[in-house]
């Protein structure tokens, strides 16, 4: 800057020291000082310049979009001229707040003073009017230097000429008339004592014009500016948006109604006063002309509220024509305000819980649909219960909401909502976080009722399921059901082999599941080929241990792996983890159940099922062969199977090892869980697998001194969560045991000794019967 300024100086001044800076251009000086004249001291100029510019805060970032845009707007203010005020600056915010409070005071005080006060030259009244007129005049001047927000084009006018032109064309005339300092004129020339009645009435008319100023300020502030105030206060006090907006709207409605009643009450007394209280007006008829202003205001307010609420005429019906017209005007304004208040209040109440309102509207349509098709009562009840458990009284368009969000925010929400599912599944714990996120973003939430078939035997597998909450049973022909509960998954082998379901899966309780379609499953595994290899490796290992083979999986495993050496390590880790969990079922001592945690097991196969159910899911495949522990049946409750010892879940990354603590738990319903029931002396059920697929069942008698009750077909439970003994185990043609009365033994079976228990005596237990077919070792 100095190099450019030196040629303009004379030759005699060329030796001026460099520290003496030549005077800068006016525009450059204003830009350096933030739009403040150079005559002000440097610290004050910078401080004032900062107050006149928009600051970087949440509101400015929402308006302009970025820090860079805010800086550009600040540069616009600096280059616009001296004392140009940005409409979003801190100075304008505090000034508008002061004007808002002063405006509310004028809205309340001025009507009362103009209507009821006769002595208008008292010091308090003069001070109030002088301060009000001063602030209104200052606001009139500042409006010429404040940028104007053009709502049509979302543009902010900062050029002085553009601001002046637009303000002169809009609200300048109204502001000028309403800002005439009448009290200044009375104080300076002292004309008020010498004014006649007509001039005095003219002065009152000028005071009434002050309402135009107040209304113009309301329109200048704009509703958006009021919302901006409340948003900034909300951020300061850390209030939630819904609560803050609801409270503000309620206060706005109540305040507007009270303010209109206040104005109407003052108007009811002002009109008779301007007519010098004629004999047919309500003030003269009630002899209230010389009463105190408080009494007059109270009666006027009561009369106005009676009209506005349409509940009567007050103390008496109107007689004179002015009172009649005032009454009609009050009724019209009151009816309009009442309708607006009811409408806003209704909309406010509905907006407070819009999701529940949408649910109620949707369920009304469902009820009409059920009535139109004349559905039976039990079906209607199931539909009602489904909606209650699926939506829980609130309905959201979740796909639309998540689709409008950014991808990182959508992934964060999905990870948070599915955190319980991820925490219960070691498959996700051992997998890449990107794989977990890719799977979770493609899951679909589903709800099933007790008795619903989630998977039907013989159908083509198009989905796999992850269990968030609930209890399900795997059913196959001629086989006992196997339990699935929180944290388990099933159906992945059919997606890998594109085969058919070999068993059905039934919901025993209300189940909240997440499904993954075959297309999404393959898309995720194509993106993460190492996880496909891991799925296939674990599936083949499980099928191999139960003597099953799958040509499709073998062919895929023979193909070269596209992954690195770390993928093979992960596969070995998953397979080893799977085998360790399977061996943990056999290695658990019978007496350790009481010392372990009471958390229910994730897999609880009650009996060994035939080999045909092995491929239903990779988790079931292990559960079918590694359950060696006996399952006692309580003599006091034939319908309940009791856990004699803690059993580990089947080895699977999807079913983690969770110990069980034996404890008393009564079966309170058809779906009562049996994973934490005690083990009283009773018969125990054991089944072994044969290559022919037949379940060979035998019963072990209770220890000496134990009692027993008859196990008949009528005592079997109806619930799938409490399966019973087969009828051939308690047939009428089976031999009875000595001394047991009504107890019966199966016609044939294999007697097995539970691990860690004492073998009953030969007098109480018959010799084991050799099965017809060869047995598969459980240690496979």
UniProtKB/Swiss-Prot annotation:
Q: Where is this region: Involved in subunit assembly?
A: 45-90
Task: Give the subcellular location.
Answer: Cell membrane
Q: Where is this region: Disordered?
A: 1-47, 549-569, 687-780
What is the catalytic activity of this protein? Answer: K(+)(in) = K(+)(out); Na(+)(in) = Na(+)(out)
The cross-references to Pfam families, in alphabetical order and at most eight, read: cNMP_binding, Ion_trans, Ion_trans_N
Show the SUPFAM superfamilies listed in the entry: cAMP-binding domain-like, Voltage-gated potassium channels
Q: How does it sit in the membrane?
A: Multi-pass membrane protein
Region spans: Interaction with KCTD3: 353-780
* Ranges lying in the membrane without crossing it: 297-318
Residue ranges in the Cytoplasmic topological domain are 1-96, 145-170, 222-252, 350-780
Compositional bias (Low complexity) = 13-32
Carbohydrate-modified residues? 290
Residue numbers carrying Phosphoserine? 634
Domain comment, as recorded: The segment S4 is the voltage-sensor and is characterized by a series of positively charged amino acids at every third position. The ion-conducting pore region is between segment S5 and S6.
Supply the name of the protein: Potassium/sodium hyperpolarization-activated cyclic nucleotide-gated channel 3
Query: To which species is this protein native?
Result: Rattus norvegicus
The gene name on file is Hcn3
């Amino acid at each position: 800057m100095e190099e450019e300024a030196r040629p303009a100086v004379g030759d005699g001044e060329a030796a001026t020291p460099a520290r003496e800076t030549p005077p800068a251009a006016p525009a450059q000086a204003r830009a350096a000082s933030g739009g403040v004249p150079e005559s002000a001291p440097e610290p004050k100029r910078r401080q004032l310049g900062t107050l006149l510019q928009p600051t970087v805060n949440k509101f400015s970032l929402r308006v302009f979009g970025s820090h860079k845009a805010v800086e550009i707007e600040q540069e616009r203010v600096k280059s616009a001229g001296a004392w140009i005020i940005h409409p979003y600056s801190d100075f304008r915010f505090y000034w508008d707040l002061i004007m808002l409070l002063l405006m509310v005071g004028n809205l309340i005080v001025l009507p009362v003073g103009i209507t009821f006060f006769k002595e208008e030259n008292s010091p308090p009244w003069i001070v109030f009017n002088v301060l009000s007129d001063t602030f209104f005049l200052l606001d009139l001047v500042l409006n010429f230097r404040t940028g104007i927000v053009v709502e049509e084009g979302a543009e902010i006018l900062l050029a002085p000429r553009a601001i002046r032109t637009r303000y002169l064309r809009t609200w300048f005339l109204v502001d000028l008339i309403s800002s005439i300092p009448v009290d200044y004129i009375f104080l300076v020339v002292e004309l008020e004592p010498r004014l006649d009645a007509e001039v005095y009435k003219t002065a009152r008319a000028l005071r009434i014009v002050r309402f135009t100023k107040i209304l113009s300020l309301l329109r200048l502030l704009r509703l958006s500016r009021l919302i901006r105030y409340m948003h900034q206060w909300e951020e300061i006090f850390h209030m939630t948006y819904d609560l803050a907006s609801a409270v503000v709207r309620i206060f706005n409605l109540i305040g507007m109604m009270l303010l209109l009643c206040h104005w109407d009450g003052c108007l009811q007394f002002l009109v008779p006063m301007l007519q010098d209280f004629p004999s047919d007006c309500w003030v003269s008829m009630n002899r209230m002309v010389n009463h105190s202003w408080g009494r007059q205001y109270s009666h006027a307010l009561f009369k106005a509220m009676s009209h506005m609420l349409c509940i009567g005429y007050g103390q008496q019906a109107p007689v004179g024509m002015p009172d009649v017209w005032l009454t009609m005007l009050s009724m019209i304004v009151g009816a309009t305000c009442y309708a607006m208040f009811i409408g806003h209040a209704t909309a406010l109440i509905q907006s407070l819980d819009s999701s529940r309102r949408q649910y109620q509207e949707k369920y009304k349509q469902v009820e009409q649909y059920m009535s139109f098709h004349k559905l039976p009562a039990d079906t209607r009840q199931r539909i009602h219960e489904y909606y209650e458990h699926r939506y829980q009284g609130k309905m959201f368009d979740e796909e639309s909401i998540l689709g409008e969000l950014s991808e990182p925010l959508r992934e964060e929400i999905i990870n948070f909502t599915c955190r319980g599912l991820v925490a219960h599944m070691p498959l996700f714990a051992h997998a890449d976080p990107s794989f977990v996120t890719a799977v979770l973003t493609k899951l679909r939430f589903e709800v099933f009722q007790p008795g619903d078939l989630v998977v039907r035997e013989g159908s083509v597998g198009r989905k796999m399921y992850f269990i968030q909450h609930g209890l399900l049973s795997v059913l196959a022909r001629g086989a006992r059901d196997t339990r699935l509960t929180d944290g388990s998954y099933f159906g992945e082998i059919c997606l890998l082999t594109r085969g058919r379901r070999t068993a059905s899966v039934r919901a025993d309780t209300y189940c909240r599941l997440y499904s993954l379609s075959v297309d999404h499953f393959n898309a995720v595994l194509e993106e993460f080929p190492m996880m496909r290899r891991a799925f296939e490796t674990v599936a083949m290992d499980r099928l191999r241990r139960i003597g099953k083979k799958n040509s499709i999986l073998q062919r895929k495993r023979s193909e070269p792996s596209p992954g690195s050496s770390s993928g093979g390590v992960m596969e070995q880790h998953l397979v080893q983890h799977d085998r360790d969990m399977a061996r943990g079922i056999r290695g658990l001592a019978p007496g350790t159940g009481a010392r372990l945690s009471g958390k229910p097991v994730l897999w609880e196969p009650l009996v060994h099922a035939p080999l045909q159910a092995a491929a239903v899911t990779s988790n079931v495949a292990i559960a079918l062969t590694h359950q060696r522990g006996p399952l006692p049946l309580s003599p006091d409750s034939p319908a309940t199977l009791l856990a004699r010892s803690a059993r580990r879940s089947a080895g699977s990354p999807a079913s983690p090892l969770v110990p069980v603590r034996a404890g008393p738990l009564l079966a309170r319903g058809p779906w009562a869980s049996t994973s934490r029931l005690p083990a009283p002396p009773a018969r125990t059920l054991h089944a072994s697998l044969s290559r022919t697929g037949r379940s060979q069942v035998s019963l072990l008698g209770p220890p000496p001194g134990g009692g027993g009750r008859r196990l008949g077909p009528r005592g079997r439970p109806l619930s799938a969560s409490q399966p019973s003994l087969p009828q051939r185990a308690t047939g009428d043609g089976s031999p009875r045991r000595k001394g047991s009365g009504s107890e019966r033994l199966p016609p044939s079976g294999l007697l097995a000794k539970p691990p860690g228990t004492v073998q009953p005596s030969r007098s109480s237990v018959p010799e084991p019967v050799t099965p017809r077919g060869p047995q598969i070792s459980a240690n496979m």
